[in-house]
Curated annotation (Swiss-Prot):
Protein name listed in UniProt: Histone-lysine N-methyltransferase, H3 lysine-9 specific
Organism lineage: Eukaryota, Fungi, Dikarya, Basidiomycota, Agaricomycotina
Domain free text: In the pre-SET domain, Cys residues bind 3 zinc ions that are arranged in a triangular cluster; some of these Cys residues contribute to the binding of two zinc ions within the cluster.
Start and end residues of each SET domain: 1590-1750
Organism: Cryptococcus neoformans var. grubii serotype A (strain H99 / ATCC 208821 / CBS 10515 / FGSC 9487) (Filobasidiella neoformans var. grubii)
Start and end residues of each Post-SET domain: 1800-1816
Entry EC no(s): 2.1.1.-, 2.1.1.367
SMART domains xref list: PreSET, SET
All residue ranges annotated as the Pre-SET domain in the record: 1516-1585
Consequences of knocking out this gene: Severely decreases localization of DMT5 to DNA. Decreases methylation of the fifth carbon of cytosine (5mC) in DNA; simultaneous disruption of UHF1 exacerbates the effect.
Example of a GO biological process term: methylation
Protein's job: Histone methyltransferase that specifically dimethylates histone H3 to form H3K9me2. H3K9me2 represents a specific tag for epigenetic transcriptional repression by recruiting HP1 proteins to methylated histones. Mainly functions in heterochromatin regions, thereby playing a central role in the establishment of constitutive heterochromatin at centromeric regions.
Basic and acidic residues bias (residue ranges): 361-370, 917-944, 966-983
């Protein structure tokens, strides 16, 4: 009935739902879940109404093994029909799906998750089966339900009860389902339900800064919401109406109604608490041991309803297990009983429970509102689920449990209800060492009305909050009454649960706890238990129970009455299971006779680190006998499992005939100021066979339950909630906590599963004391599950009680008498034989099989990631020291020598031995390095000696050759083998014979020939002529030839001309030359090739007429009537034929140094191939003589033995003289050729006779080149920065020199003939030929040489302006250089395989570095797994910066606007990358215009991978389900990080619990997207970005340009940012460094971390892929360092010139306050770390943030795993840390068009004490 009010004047049952989906026209909803038909009969909805539930956080509290679970819809009475009511309630056949933000954590229950994830749903569901609707506690993060948790159970409900069974599901998150109008509260049976829901977590998201604002519902403006028991206090303001909130999903099964949870707003001290209707009288009782309530009676019309009372109605026949709609396996739950004693101070009359019970009989009955007597003295009212102290403790209702600000639970959403402004207090105490206790009460004793303080007394004496953070223990026993703060002396000591104040405990992070009136022993049980027993024991105590008012034992005993007949009737039902978890709430009449009651309580507190792990735990059982109350305090020692939990595949299921015990605790207080208060009314919560339908009740057996204590076998995992931003409760206890209100639950911090703050920021385990009769629940275990069950701990019986574990006292268990356990099948027979000193002791094998619930039942369902702390070691401790005179147990932490007397000595000995072995290994490594160095020096010396010997032989051969070819000055004749002397050719006037003589050269294949223009290449003859002198076979024989003009000619087909065979000494392996510089990207790739293909200017000068009729040079000469003897050309050709390595396949084949002497060279593959096929070994060669300088030079050979192939013939392997001769021509086509079939022809000169036009073409057509292969094989090559140097067979260069670079023919001037032909290199000072400006520009553009190479070896790496002028270099016209193949100055000793560029797809022509290609080819990376490869950002987008640059001129006149636009540009660029950081401001107080920096770069916080760079690769992820534990032994990320700590002695992650870096000299390995941990993991600091409180700004300095400074105080170790930019190779960084040197700025940082070349040992055990990469990188680093002779290696660099973020503005300081380290976040390749920046020390406000371009400055402060020997002298680099990153140093010289090369201004202006005046480190 909308708007109906009870007689008490309050809204009876305002079902608060989400206003978004509510319907104002809906009628009330009964709590029992039944739908009332018009005829009065009960009717239940079938399954199809809510069969499909959305994947949301829903807890289904129903259990059943039946496949056909019947679901009922909780509809409101008053509807005409069931479908209509369903429509009014907003229920559809398919549950609507509300789009909800996904959660990275688990969700407590998921209606669409697999069955193994539904056990928590089933586990929690039983709490609300008979309550109907329960309030929700403050929420934590939704987490995934435990996996593989499947427990067996039976359908214990009889068929007779199925018709009346009503089971409910309690949702805990806001999703749409049943909706009602929260603005119009509904009246249902006179019961009020106040619940709270949440749609957001309190853990994973930071709390909002605006607290929730209480709202009022328009339907309840006149009368505040009240309960049904006692009138509200006059001092409390009226309770506000319930606001409209989001709806919550309801999953129903069987015939139960769906309880609705929704938030409640509370104002001031008014506390809204649920009132639960009483139990119908027709409920049946199934077990005699279950506490059952008496029949309910009608409530009088004038009974007052206090705002803090609680009444609960139990649905009828809620005894059946109903399988949830998600097919979750049933989970047996510990039977519990909650007994809040609540009385009305208004005199005799029916209680609120009876009124509520009567109200349920007719759901549409209206009750007239009752007026509250404001003059009536306030009596102790009951706040369900919360304790209150005798003194008021006023605190803001919405304060967090730790910070005093708005709690996360209340500030997450507007729909969450704020906490009550009045914080209830308790006298329980939390010890000084992280203790949080929750205790229940003994049976309340009789309290006289006179002992209660008046209202004024309660207002005058408030209790101030505790300032020391921890409440103190009171020795004096007290009993507290809920809601009034009154206390009366009681017969029994009444322990109460702790209620935290708003004062934060400094040591634990918890709130201060009030004093405890009783020193009841508590136990130490780790939080988040791993056994079913512990989980069951915690369950009823999630919400702090309300203590009863003091009352006598007789009154307490009258609170529960049972009927033996009803019990017997219930036992006759076959299918009633003893483990039924129906939660029944009994209401008792005043006339009921006094029976017995059993009360239990739980204490939750973390253990003291100094106490033994086997400290005995306590359990407290309060037995109220018929006339006498007896307190049973038992103790037992629980030994934690110190290793991994043992698993067991056997499961012992409980017998169906077992009798389930009932655990009960008071849920309310009783007491009053009148005589009528003596008849207290108590309400019991209990689990087991329902007794709600029985009117008669049976007294339960006092021995039904044996007190016991259980402890988990494993430590709590890391993902357990920690009190950081408010009260945090594990999701397992959300629905179960509905027995208390929002305030009470929030203030009880450590109930059940709340963690206290540990010493290192990790959660400590609270102590949990439970009671017996819980270990008998042996659920079904899925043997196929991956998560194996955990064995239960050993249990011992003991009658000795101990003190709190925080008191540092522990006692040995005495009288360890094994007692019958509820686990045993025969335990039901022993219920009556249990004494108060008895306890449970279970056999190890039996417990391991029956307690295999482990983490499954406790809500974890996953393996533990929490390593035990010092108080709970994982491994078993040695027990050698058995004789302990101090009486302390061996394993106790109080034992000074727990490992025996000799353990310390042996341990130290082992430690010293280990250190000694490490030192020895270090010495061996040093010796090995020395040996390697000596070996390298010895090999180098051998190479040098061999080089000297080769040079000596070469010099001797050259001298011999010069003597042979010495030309007589007068006769100009050449001696022949037959002794004749050839005369000079006749004068041009003499007629010339048309028959030319052809000289045949004896060669080995392949050969090439040069024939006269009109002649043809004659086929080689197999035998020589008879006239050949065998002794002079190596000499040159030249026949008489007619006079001719001597000019080069093509190799043409041989003609039948007269030929003379002349064997010629050739070097083995000669062959045709190969074009090596035809490629624009690699012009000098071949070491033994000739630059070919460019036409030369044909010589126009002719020889003078001179006497002589002989040819010159021993080659065929065509006499044309002119003096055509050209010794120079003849000798040049001879040398080319003898010593030039053109095609040699032998490794000893050298490079010709006379490549520049070729005049006209072309490649004719097809023609030469045809010639070679037709020819044999002998190929005729003919060449025309050419006139040089108008003179002829004759040469003669004085040694006829020249040309013989002997051992003295050494290849000519000296470098070419720079500037001498002409530069090698460059081919006009850009394609490269293959060496195997190419050949060389010498072009024709200006001879008058040309046989054909085809022969006169010096260069073949272009198609000959286009079909050639694009790559040239290059074995045994040596390439230097300046060009090509010949290489010997031992792979060492002779000297560093530059080859003459090719110059395009268009830019080459006409060659001037030399006055003197220096055919051979002389041992004299080299003369440099002046290079033109075009030649210099061509060299610079093609990176063929550098300044040092052009000057030769005597330049000493410096080029003076005079030398630059001599070279004629025009340095002002330098353009952007191009990347070519250049290697370092020294060559590795090992031979390399031929390099193919196609082997590595990431090396392109524009970024090809011979050293990189060689290294990556020789030591390639193994292929990456596809699942680890991620997409790289290849291109940067300029769409953001281009509009700013286009509009820059418009806002330069307004500096403020200009700066604002720059700030907006940064914010726009990083909106999707670093959204959590504070905005970056720009300040300019130096410049007159005050503008920001130029928009010259693209702003981004992501690394850019240009084309040619491999994509990022992720590392192996961990399998942690929650935040990673730094002490975990299974987390892969922790193990990998510890390896990279090397010898720093650090454990865990690189960060502490506050996100601060612990050591900035070690590399950081964060978790990645392959890990299972959430974003809140402590190992994801860089991924979360810069914190919002870390404010920075870009400001203009006076001398250093732009810089960065702090806007606020920044502590040490804070993450500032990442140095992002373009990831480029080392070759590219070298090339860009030239440009940056010219402009005076550099933004290049080298990735040269120490860890790159020193991978840790044992990495292959953690990540095999990472170990393979590290090994390949290590080999490349060694090879590169051996080549460059440097101490550092970096394959990549980061350039932030065109692409980066604010870190590019950091200036240099020799004493920086920032440290750059290398981290692996999104790319785990060892060579590609991310440069991250942290603070080295505390930074003040407005202090400039600086880094060091040299790396970390002080070597002594940096620990290194190996001793580092510093180099002598000050030019070497300092040893960097393991991750030190230094800026790429610019070139020492800068280019200047006027002054040549000048010094770079490398001046440091930091002003530090250790400043050396330089900003960069330069190598040797």
């Amino acid at each position: 009935m909308p708007g109906a009010r009870s007689e008490a004047g309050g809204v009876d049952n305002p079902l608060v739902l989400d206003s978004s989906d509510s319907d104002d026209n809906l009628s009330g909803l009964p709590l029992n879940g039944r739908v009332k038909r018009i005829d009065g009969n009960d009717r239940s909805y079938k399954k199809k109404s809510l069969t499909s539930m959305r994947k949301s956080t829903v807890v289904d509290l129903t259990l059943s093994d039946s496949d056909e679970a019947v679901e009922s819809v909780n509809l409101l009475p008053g509807s005409s029909s069931t479908p209509d009511r369903a429509a009014q309630a907003g229920i559809s056949d398919k549950q609507p799906s509300l789009r909800r933000r996904p959660r990275p954590f688990m969700s407590i229950a998921d209606s669409s998750s697999p069955p193994e994830n539904q056990n928590v749903i089933s586990f929690l569901g039983n709490h609300s089966q008979e309550i109907g609707e329960l309030p929700s506690p403050p929420l934590v993060e939704d987490r995934a339900a435990p996996n593989k948790m499947e427990l067996g159970g039976e359908n214990i409900a009889g068929q007779n009860n199925e018709a009346n069974a009503a089971q409910a599901a309690v949702p805990v998150s806001g999703t749409p389902s049943l909706t009602l109008s929260s603005n119009r509260p509904q009246s249902v049976s006179g019961a009020q339900l106040v619940v709270a829901s949440s749609s957001r977590s309190a853990i994973n998201s930071p709390p909002r800064r605006t607290p929730s604002i209480p709202q009022q519902s328009p339907s309840s403006r006149a009368t505040p919401c009240r309960s049904a028991s006692i009138a509200s206090s006059r001092s409390r303001p009226p309770t506000p109406p319930l606001p409209a909130t989001q709806s919550t999903p309801v999953t129903v099964s069987r015939r139960l109604a769906s309880p609705i949870l929704s938030p409640v707003q509370a104002v001031s001290s008014a506390i809204i608490s649920p009132t639960i209707p009483s139990i119908p009288s027709h409920a049946s009782l199934s077990d005699p041991t279950i506490l059952s309530p008496p029949s309910a009676t009608s409530a009088p019309p004038n009974s007052p309803i206090p705002s803090t009372s609680t009444t609960v109605q139990t649905p009828a026949a809620a005894l059946t297990y109903a399988r949830p709609s998600t097919s979750a396996a049933p989970l047996p739950v510990m039977p519990i009983s909650v007994t809040p004693a609540t009385t009305s101070p208004a005199g005799p009359g029916p209680s609120a429970l009876q009124s509520a019970s009567e109200a349920t009989k007719s759901s549409d009955q209206k009750e007239s509102p009752r007026k509250t007597n404001s003059k009536q003295p306030s009596s102790p009212s009951s706040t369900h689920g919360r304790w209150t102290d005798t003194r008021l403790f006023h605190t803001p209702s919405n304060l967090s449990a730790t910070s005093g600000k708005s709690s996360a639970a209340s500030s997450r959403s507007k729909s969450r209800a704020p906490l009550s402004s009045r914080a209830a207090m308790s006298d329980n105490v939390a010890g000084p060492s992280k203790t949080t206790s929750v205790s229940s009460t003994h049976p309340p004793s009789r309290a006289s009305p006179s002992s209660l303080p008046s209202q004024s007394q309660r207002q005058v004496h408030p209790r101030p909050p505790s300032r020391d953070g921890v409440g103190k223990r009171e020795k004096k026993s007290k009993t507290l009454s809920s809601g009034t703060g009154q206390s009366t002396p009681s017969k029994f000591s009444l322990p109460t649960s702790d209620v935290a104040s708003n004062q934060k405990n400094k040591s634990t992070g918890l709130n201060a706890l009030p004093k405890k009136p009783s020193s009841t022993p508590t136990s130490s049980i780790p939080q988040r238990t791993s056994t079913l027993a512990t989980a069951m024991a915690i369950r009823p105590f999630v919400r702090s129970p309300t203590p009863p008012s003091p009352q006598s034992s007789s009154e307490a005993s009258r609170s529960i009455q049972t009927s033996r007949g009803a019990v017997k009737a219930a036992q006759n039902q076959d299918k009633i299971h003893p483990l039924s978890t129906a939660l029944s709430i009994s209401s008792h009449s005043r006339e009921a006779t006094t029976k017995a009651t059993t009360l239990f309580h739980t204490t939750s507190s973390p253990p003291s680190p100094s106490q033994s792990t086997s400290a005995p735990t306590k359990s407290h059982v309060v037995w109220n006998a018929q006339k006498l109350g007896t307190t049973v305090l038992s103790s037992e020692r629980i030994h934690l499992s110190r290793g991994k939990s043992q698993t067991s595949d056997s499961v012992v299921a409980p017998a169906a005939s077992q009798t389930a015990a009932s655990l009960s605790y008071p849920a309310g207080t009783s007491g009053g100021a009148r005589e009528a208060d003596k008849k207290a009314v108590e309400t019991s919560f209990h689990a087991g066979p329902s007794s709600a339908d029985f009117e008669a009740f049976v007294q339960p057996s006092t021995s039904a339950i044996a007190p016991t204590t259980v402890r988990p076998s494993v430590a709590p995992p890391e993902d357990a909630p920690v009190l950081k931003s408010g009260s945090i409760i594990h999701p397992l206890f959300r629905a179960a906590s509905a027995i208390g209100d929002q305030n009470a639950f929030t203030k009880t911090e450590a109930v059940g599963d709340v963690l206290s703050q540990g010493s290192k920021g990790r959660a400590s385990s609270p102590r949990i004391t439970t009671t017996g009769a819980v270990s008998h629940l042996a659920p079904h275990v899925d043997l196929g599950s991956k998560i194996k069950p955990t064995a239960a701990p050993s249990l011992f019986a003991s009658g000795v009680t101990t003190k709190n574990v925080d008191d540092q006292d522990s006692a040995q268990p005495q009288n360890q008498t094994p007692l019958p356990s509820a686990i045993s099948v025969s335990s039901k027979k022993n219920h009556g034989s249990l004494s108060k000193e008895s306890s449970i002791k279970s056999a190890a094998s039996f417990i391991s099989s029956s307690s295999t619930l482990g983490d499954s039942v406790s809500g974890l369902g996953r393996k533990s990631h929490h390593k035990s702390t010092q108080s709970m070691p994982q491994s078993p401790l040695p027990t050698t020291n058995t004789n302990n005179s101090s009486g302390i147990e061996v394993n106790s932490w109080l034992n000074p020598q727990p490992f025996g007397p000799s353990f310390a000595a042996s341990h130290l000995s082992i430690h010293a031995k280990k250190k000694w072995k490490e030192r020895e290994r270090g010495k061996e490594r040093e010796k090995e390095k020395v040996r390697e160095k000596e070996k390298a020096e010895e090999e180098n010396e051998q190479l040098r000696q061999r080089r000297i010997a080769d040079l000596e032989k070469l010099s001797a051969n050259l001298e011999l050759y010069k003597r042979r070819m010495d030309v007589e000055s007068r006769t100009r004749s050449i001696p022949r083998a037959d002794g004749e002397t050839r005369k000079r050719p006749p004068s041009p006037g003499i007629s010339v014979s048309t028959d030319a003589e052809v000289r045949v050269v004896k060669r080995s294949k392949p050969t090439w020939a040069i024939a006269p223009e009109g002649g043809h290449v004659a086929p080689a003859m197999e035998k020589e002529s008879a006239n050949v002198n065998k002794k002079a076979a190596d000499a040159i024989k030249i026949n008489h030839q007619p006079a001719s003009s001597y000019a080069p000619a093509f190799a043409t087909p041989a003609s039948p001309a007269k030929a003379t065979r002349t064997p010629l000494s050739v070097t083995a392996g000669l062959g045709p030359p190969v074009n090596s510089s035809s490629s624009t990207s690699t012009p000098s790739l071949l070491s033994r090739s000739i630059n070919l293909g460019i036409l030369r200017d044909k010589p126009k000068d002719h020889m003078d007429d001179d006497d002589g009729d002989d040819s010159a040079g021993g080659l065929p000469v065509r006499k044309t009537g002119k003096n055509g003897a050209v010794e120079e050309q003849v000798e040049q050709v001879r040398l080319d034929l003898d010593d030039v390595s053109i095609h040699g396949s032998s490794p000893a084949a050298p490079l010709s140094i006379f490549t520049s002497r070729f005049r006209d060279v072309s490649i004719t593959p097809s023609r030469i191939q045809k010639t070679l096929e037709e020819s044999d070994n002998d190929v005729p060669i003919q060449r025309y003589a050419v006139k040089v300088n108008g003179k002829q030079k004759a040469q003669r050979s004085k040694d006829k033995s020249y040309g013989s192939e002997s051992e003295n013939d050494v290849p000519l392997n000296w470098p070419s003289r720079k500037g001498k001769g002409r530069t090698a021509p460059e081919p006009q086509d850009s394609s490269e050729t293959q060496r195997d079939d190419d050949d060389v022809n010498l072009g024709s000169g200006d001879g008058e006779e040309r046989p054909s036009d085809d022969d006169s073409i010096p260069v073949p057509p272009a198609p000959l080149f286009k079909d050639r292969t694009a790559h040239v094989r290059q074995p045994l090559q040596t390439l230097f920065k300046g060009g090509i140097v010949a290489k010997h067979s031992y792979q060492r260069p002779l000297a560093k020199a530059s080859a003459v670079s090719p110059v395009p023919s268009a830019n080459r001037p006409s060659p001037a003939p030399s006055a003197k032909a220096d055919l051979l290199p002389q041992k004299r000072k080299r003369r440099l030929k002046k290079i033109t400006s075009q030649q210099w520009q061509h060299i610079a553009q093609n990176s063929l040489s550098d300044v040092d190479d052009l000057l030769g070896e005597s330049s000493k790496k410096r080029l003076s302006p005079e030398n630059a002028e001599k070279l004629g270099a025009d340095l002002s016209k330098l353009t952007r250089p191009r990347v070519f193949s250049i290697v370092s100055r020294s060559e590795p000793r090992t031979k390399r395989e031929p390099i193919e560029e196609d082997n590595n797809e990431y090396f392109t022509d524009s970024d090809s570095h011979t050293s990189d290609v060689a290294l990556f080819s020789q030591h390639p990376d193994p292929p990456p797994p596809p699942e680890r490869i991620r997409e790289a950002k290849r291109n940067f987008d300029t769409r953001n910066i281009d509009p700013w640059n286009r509009q820059k001129h418009t806002f330069r006149s307004n500096p403020a606007l200009h700066r604002a636009i720059f700030e907006a540009y940064i914010m726009q660029s990083t909106s999707m990358e670093e959204s959590g950081g504070d905005d970056i401001k720009v300040t300019n107080d130096v410049d007159a215009d005050g503008g920001p920096p130029d928009f010259e770069f693209v702003y981004s916080d992501t690394m850019l991978y240009p084309d040619g760079i491999p994509p990022p690769e992720l590392g192996l992820g961990c399998d942690c389900d929650g935040p990673c534990d730094p002490d975990s032994e299974t987390c892969t990320c922790v193990k990998r990080q510890e390896l990279y700590f090397y010898d720093l002695g650090l454990k865990g992650f690189a960060y502490d619990e506050n996100g601060k870096i612990r050591e900035n000299s070690a590399s950081i390995w964060e978790c990645n997207e392959l890990c299972g941990c959430p974003p809140e993991c402590m190992n994801r600091v860089i991924q979360r970005g810069r914190a919002r409180d870390t404010g920075i700004e870009i400001f203009k300095t006076k001398e250093k340009g732009w810089g960065i400074r702090a806007r606020s105080f920044i502590p040490s170790g804070t993450y500032i940012g990442s140095y992002t930019g373009e990831l480029i190779r080392e070759a590219e960084s070298e090339r860009r460094g030239v440009t940056y040197t010219a402009i005076g700025r550099t933004y290049v940082f080298d990735l040269d971390g120490w860890q790159i070349r020193h991978p840790p040992k044992g990495l292959e055990k953690i990540d095999k892929r990472a170990a393979e990469l590290a090994e390949a990188v290590k080999m490349r680093a060694r090879a590169a360092m051996r080549e460059s002779q440097e101490d550092a290696y970096n394959a990549y660099s980061v350039d932030a010139f065109h692409y980066g973020n604010f870190t590019r503005y950091f200036n240099h300081s020799c004493d920086p306050n920032l440290a750059i380290t290398q981290a692996y976040v999104k790319d785990f390749h060892p060579e590609r770390p991310l440069l991250v920046i942290f603070t080295r020390r505390d930074i003040k406000k407005h202090e400039e943030l600086c880094i060091s371009y040299k790396g970390i400055p002080d070597d002594d402060d940096i620990p290194s795993p190996e001793p580092v020997k510093k180099k002598k002298g000050g030019k070497g680099k300092k040893q960097m840390s393991k991750t030190s990153a230094s800026a790429h140093p610019p070139e020492m010289t800068a280019l200047n068009s006027d002054k040549g090369l000048v010094e770079v201004k490398d001046i440091c202006r930091c002003g530090a004490k250790n400043c050396d005046g330089r900003m960069f480190n330069y190598g040797p």
